[in-house]
């Protein structure tokens, strides 16, 4: 029996479920790609394209066809058996509260947990509707009940930071600080690719949305090992010859579409001289990032202390490979001579002119075709035109002195970093796919419950709500729009503002976060991908050997956002629910 008398609740739920999914794209997905963009492994536009494809494919392809009526299992839905429309109202209030809070958090650049946001909304409406006794504060297992939120504040960042630190330290002392690190990377990169593929296969097998495999444990182990070995072999055959031509021989004529040629690339002739205006085959991943000596020289020059500036420049240029913070083997890849006392402004690496997708507003009245088309482009592509990397260098209340922060971190060999950029792209894309497969339920799970209650007029059986494909497409589309239009706001507040990012660091962060999600999935521990990547970023930053490489003010700001997520969303939802169900009306005397 369709509850047509509550069509307005379905309409309101649809609007705010779209806003909730939009915020997941602008907040949750954006912080997943922040490290890759900050490390220059991908451009912002490339991150938007890859993120959109992987999130949409994960959501629609293997997204949950069946969602828990209340995903976080903090309110007993059987209490609403006699009044299913009241649960419908409660879920609408929860989605409204979650979307409002996420909008505020995204506006202020706070990376927050969307799972905890919707949980707060459900708790608030549950207290207002059935009282505090109807809320499951402590569950029968570690992943049930409200207490799981508090455990997640410690478990997620702690585990992710530990795993990411181990991965980066192995990379640091096994490759980056060794003599000839590029050749060491040629050995380690295929192994890392195989390990990463095996771990991501494990994640898909254990947390793969609606398509649950029915394999025995030995079959699962064999599949994981087989996928890892096969991927490592493919990388060795096809990618490594291409990287050899690019990194070692500096073949400036090669493009990414030459990768399928594999071993045939080794038979190419001598590399012709590059064009005079060429900027090199491998980009400088540390462009605009200063070492301590370079920063001291530039600031001394700005303060008029020419003697100190000259001394710092001489010290730095006389030993360009001198490690920072007492480390050995690290390579400084920038020319210090540009930081002489003759420069009163910061020396910046030459940046190519960025061609915007929106362009200037054409002349004419607002209702003309050209101007209206420009407004459409502005709405769709304004976010893509944002210069995220430059924004991360700007000072703000929470960004501290970013240049000083980066000066305490070591700069490793640039060509070696280039090889790790491909690993980082792989981990980010795969993490985005699994995020779409699972976390889209934060937005469409409650909405699917509202839709089924409206359609059937009764509680879903066994606390499960069917999720039609059109709802998955609806949620995934709103998520992608949020990523494209406002994802830059979270990205520019993260990445290099927490610690110095580079491909080797970013790969370690993302893989450490993925390992944490895999382990938590298997052990059913309550973790958030947002909290995992933040903990991994801090863990890798501390591997520089000093706490000064971390922007603790920003970390505290992020933690504050986690702390207030559940109570703020709960208060908004509870107030809405309480006001509505207790509101005076005609003929009501109670």
UniProtKB/Swiss-Prot annotation:
Which chain positions lie within coiled-coil regions?
none
Here the segments flagged for biased composition (Polar residues) are 313-322
What does its activity-regulation comment describe?
A: Phosphate transport activity is competitively inhibited by vanadate and arsenate.
Broad class of the protein's primary localization: membrane
Instruction: Share an example GO biological-process annotation for this protein.
Output: phosphate ion transmembrane transport
Q: Which GO terms describe its cellular component?
A: plasma membrane
List the ranges whose topology is Cytoplasmic. 267-466
UniProt entry tagged with the keyword DNA-binding: no
Identify the stretch(es) annotated as Disordered.
Answer: 297-361
Parts of the chain that traverse the membrane = 6-26, 44-64, 85-105, 118-138, 149-169, 186-206, 220-240, 246-266, 467-487, 506-525, 527-547, 561-581
Q: What happens when the gene is disrupted?
A: Impairs growth at low phosphate conditions when pho-5 is also absent. Prevents vanadate uptake.
For this UniProt record, the keywords arranged alphabetically read as follows: Cell membrane, Membrane, Phosphate transport, Symport, Transmembrane, Transmembrane helix, Transport
Top-level division of the source organism's lineage = Eukaryota
Location(s), subcellular: Cell membrane
On induction, the UniProt comment says:
Transcription is controlled by the phosphorus-acquisition regulatory system.
Query: Looking at the keywords, is RNA-binding present?
Result: no
Q: Name one Pfam family in it.
A: PHO4
Q: Which Gene Ontology MF annotations are present? A: sodium:phosphate symporter activity
- Name the InterPro entries for this protein: Phos_transporter
- Membrane-topology annotation of the record: Multi-pass membrane protein
Ranges of compositional bias, category Basic and acidic residues: 325-345
Entry's family note: Belongs to the inorganic phosphate transporter (PiT) (TC 2.A.20) family.
Q: What does this protein do?
A: High-affinity transporter for external inorganic phosphate. Acts probably as a sodium-phosphate symporter. Component of the high affinity phosphate transport system II (ptsII) necessary for scavenging phosphorus from the environment under conditions of limiting phosphorus.
Stated name of the protein: Phosphate-repressible phosphate permease pho-4
Q: Which organism is it from?
A: Neurospora crassa (strain ATCC 24698 / 74-OR23-1A / CBS 708.71 / DSM 1257 / FGSC 987)
């Amino acid at each position: 029996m369709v509850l047509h008398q509550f069509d307005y609740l379905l309409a309101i739920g649809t609007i705010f479920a779209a806003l909730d999914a939009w915020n997941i794209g602008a907040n949750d997905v954006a912080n997943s790609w922040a490290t890759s963009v900050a490390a220059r492994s991908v451009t912002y536009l490339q991150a938007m394209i890859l993120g959109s494809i992987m999130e949409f494919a994960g959501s629609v392809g293997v997204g949950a066809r069946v969602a828990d009526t209340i995903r976080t299992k903090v309110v007993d839905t059987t209490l609403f058996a006699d009044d299913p429309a009241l649960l419908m109202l409660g879920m609408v209030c929860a989605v409204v509260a979650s979307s409002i809070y996420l909008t505020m958090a995204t506006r202020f650049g706070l990376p927050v947990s969307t799972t905890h946001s919707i949980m707060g909304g459900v708790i608030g409406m549950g207290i207002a509707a059935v009282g505090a006794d109807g809320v499951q504060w402590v569950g029968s297992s570690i992943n049930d009940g409200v207490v799981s939120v508090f455990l997640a504040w410690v478990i997620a960042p702690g585990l992710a930071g530990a795993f990411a630190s181990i991965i980066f330290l192995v990379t640091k002392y096994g490759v980056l600080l060794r003599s000839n690190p590029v050749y060491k990377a040629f050995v380690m990169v295929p192994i890392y690719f195989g390990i990463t593929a095996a771990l991501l296969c494990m994640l898909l097998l254990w947390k793969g949305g609606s398509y649950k495999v029915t394999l025995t444990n030995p079959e699962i182990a064999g599949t994981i090992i087989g996928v890892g070995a096969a991927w490592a072999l493919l990388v060795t055959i096809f990618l490594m010859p291409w990287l050899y031509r690019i990194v070692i021989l500096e073949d400036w004529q090669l493009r990414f579409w030459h990768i399928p040629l594999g071993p045939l690339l080794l038979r190419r002739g001598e590399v012709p001289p590059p064009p005079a205006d060429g900027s090199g085959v491998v980009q400088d991943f540390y462009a605009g990032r200063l070492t301590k000596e370079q920063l001291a020289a530039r600031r001394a020059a700005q303060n008029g202390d020419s003697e100190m500036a000259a001394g710092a420049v001489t010290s730095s240029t006389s030993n360009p490979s001198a490690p920072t913070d007492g480390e050995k083997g690290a390579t400084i890849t920038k020319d210090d001579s540009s930081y002489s006392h003759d420069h009163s402004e910061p020396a910046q690496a030459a940046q190519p002119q960025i061609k915007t997708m929106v362009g200037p507003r054409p002349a004419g009245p607002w209702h003309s075709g050209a101007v209206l088309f420009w407004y459409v482009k502005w709405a769709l592509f304004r976010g893509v035109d944002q210069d995220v990397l430059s924004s991360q260098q700007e000072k703000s209340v929470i960004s501290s002195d970013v240049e000083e922060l980066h000066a305490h971190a070591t700069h490793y060999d640039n060509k070696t970093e280039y090889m790790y950029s491909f690993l980082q792209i792989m981990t980010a894309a795969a993490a985005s796919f699994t995020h779409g497969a699972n976390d889209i339920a934060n937005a469409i799970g409650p909405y699917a419950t509202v839709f089924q209650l409206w359609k059937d007029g009764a509680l879903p059986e066994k606390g499960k709500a069917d999720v039609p494909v059109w709802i998955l497409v609806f949620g995934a589309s709103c998520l992608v729009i949020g990523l494209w239009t406002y994802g830059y706001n979270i990205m520019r507040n993260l990445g290099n503002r927490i610690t110095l990012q580079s491909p080797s660091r970013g790969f370690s962060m993302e893989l450490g976060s993925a390992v944490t999600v895999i382990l938590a999935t298997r052990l059913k521990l309550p973790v958030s991908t947002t909290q995992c990547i933040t903990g991994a970023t801090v863990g890798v930053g501390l591997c520089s050997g000093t706490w000064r490489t971390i922007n603790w003010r920003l970390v505290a700001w992020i933690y504050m956002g986690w702390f207030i997520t559940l109570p703020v969303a709960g208060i908004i939802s509870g107030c809405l629910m309480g006001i509505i169900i207790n509101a005076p009306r005609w003929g009501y005397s109670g």
